[in-house]
Amino acid sequence: MSFNIETTQGLERRVNITVPSEAVEQAVREELKRVAKNARIDGFRKGKVPAQMIEKRFGASVRQDVLGDLLQKHFFNVMLENKVNLAGRPEFTVEQFEAGKELKFTATFEVYPEVQLQGLDKIKVEKPVVEISDADIDKMLDILRKQQATWIETQDVAKADDRVTIDFVGSVDGEEFEGGKSTDFVLAMGQGRMIPGFEEGIIGHKAGEQFEINVTFPETYHAENLKGKAAKFSITLKKVEVMQLPELTDEFVAKFGPNTKNVADLRNEIAKNMQRELKNALVSRIKTQVIDGLLEQNPIEVPTAAVEQEIEVLRNQAAQRFGGNAQQAAQLPRELFEEQAKRRVQVGLLFSEVISSNELKADEERVKAMIADIASAYEQPAEVIEYYSKNKELMNNIRNVVLEQQAVDAVLTKAQVTEKASSFDEVMNPQA
């Protein structure tokens, strides 16, 4: 066998392979012998059919089967012997395949890029430093109380944190518009659900009043025909309710688990949960900065085949999230996922190089610590730990996550890391 590999463009390669006629005919003869052992032809016992008749009856189909085997065998032998990092499937073109002659074919394929990390010392990472304060815990406790709150009807005027029930009809230039009308609409004030000015127009009115408010739709409003338009809403205020928060009693505290017997216990549990959420948020934020830095300093071309595979993964995940199936997933436009798929392939290649160049292996102590951390959020942590330890797929997933974290840590040792004092809210709600 002879071959030569050439670069066509980018990551695309082409290999030209020639297989000697003797090797081709030997493969055909062996396959014909195998077929002859099981061939059934009237007038002959099984396995006793003359070779000429086998050749005449099965020769053409056998040669096609042998061709497929030879293409795969010799192509992948070349790939292995030359340590080619193949991406995706090859496309074969047969140039010569005739009895008694050499087999000549070409295979076009893509390879993964050779990644050589650079610029790690130019990556900038801002690491938030956060202390969870009593005020943070108080705020979270208030959220829990609000989740358990009841609403009491009042005859007072509506305020910014009340709940109201209204009928409304909206119009632009005197004409009602689609989606601008509702009856018995329940609105919890102060949550930013409505366009600017709508809730403010309700504040100060009492149940039973009818009034009009004038507002302007934002330029960023989702409905194209309403962007930036002045609108008038006719409103009937039917009910005003005030929030009544539950008292911090032992009965209230007991709703949050068997380990919370008093307010101090509840505050401790809240602090633990906040610490766990904060830890995960910090890991995610730092990882994102490291990834962004790696991509900026190491722009790499990625094989189309790998991107297409990732697009299919993202398509199926999107379909599953919305209750769809594989057929529906295939109908989702690839453009929706192309950039994300490309980024994921790039990140995978860069992290693989970080792991390889630093000879990293998943730290089993960190694996155990991560499982224990996950289990601590459940009422029976020991059962969760046992469940993970007996599930090979889950354990491998955790090891992969830990290995990624170790790769991030390896980059951080060379990156420019600065610490910044931050609040819990700043880290958990960066867009607020």
From Swiss-Prot:
Reaction(s) the record says it catalyses: [protein]-peptidylproline (omega=180) = [protein]-peptidylproline (omega=0)
Disulfide-bonded cysteines: none
Bilayer-spanning residue ranges: none
Cellular component GO terms held in the UniProt record: cytoplasm
Predominant localisation class: cytoplasm
InterPro entries with a match to the protein in the record: PPIase_dom_sf, PPIase_FKBP_dom, Trig_fac, Trigger_fac_C, Trigger_fac_C_sf, Trigger_fac_ribosome-bd_bac, Trigger_fac_ribosome-bd_sf, Trigger_fact/SurA_dom_sf
Keyword Cell cycle: yes
Subcellular location: Cytoplasm
GO biological process, one term: chaperone-mediated protein folding
Every PPIase FKBP-type domain range: 161-246
Keyword NAD recorded: no
Main enzyme class: isomerase
Single GO molecular function: ribosome binding
Enzyme Commission number(s) from the entry: 5.2.1.8
Annotated signal peptide: none
Domain remarks in the Swiss-Prot or TrEMBL record: Consists of 3 domains; the N-terminus binds the ribosome, the middle domain has PPIase activity, while the C-terminus has intrinsic chaperone activity on its own.
Role this protein plays: Involved in protein export. Acts as a chaperone by maintaining the newly synthesized protein in an open conformation. Functions as a peptidyl-prolyl cis-trans isomerase.
HAMAP family hit by this protein: Trigger_factor_Tig (MF_00303)
Family: Belongs to the FKBP-type PPIase family. Tig subfamily.
Protein name per the record: Trigger factor
Species whose genome carries this gene: Histophilus somni (strain 2336) (Haemophilus somnus)
